[in-house]
Regions:
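Mid-chain, well-packed structural core segment of small domains
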Residues: 71, 76-95
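Acidic, glycine/proline-rich low-complexity segments that act as flexible tails and inter-domain linkers
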Residues: 1-65, 92
Length: 95
């Protein structure tokens, strides 16, 4: 990929990018991709496609409930770095 900020164009990635932006906010997503190195950019693509383009697309849980579960899991695991962004996401989802 010659342009570091060019994103894959497949539907799963694009749906994941839209959901990730909806939940986490544009600034969070922009920062995640802007801060990615050549080594970590594939991981950002994977997270966007697998987590946000697959798991977060399922309609068995609404976004508010899914966010609250995520916050609870991250809290229990002591993952404070990830928790900060997901608390903002939960607030974006009405929690």
């Amino acid at each position: 990929m010659t342009n570091k900020h060019a994103h894959p164009t497949d539907a799963v990635f694009q749906n994941g990018l839209a959901k990730r932006t909806q939940v986490m906010g544009q600034a969070f997503v922009d920062k995640a991709f802007a801060g990615a190195s050549d080594f970590t950019l594939p991981m950002q693509h994977h997270i966007t496609r697998a987590a946000w383009g697959d798991s977060w697309q399922r309609d068995v849980l609404d976004l508010k409930t899914r966010s609250l579960i995520t916050v609870a899991m991250l809290t229990a695991l002591g993952k404070t770095h990830e928790l900060k962004g997901h608390v903002r996401g939960a607030l974006n989802n009405g929690a």
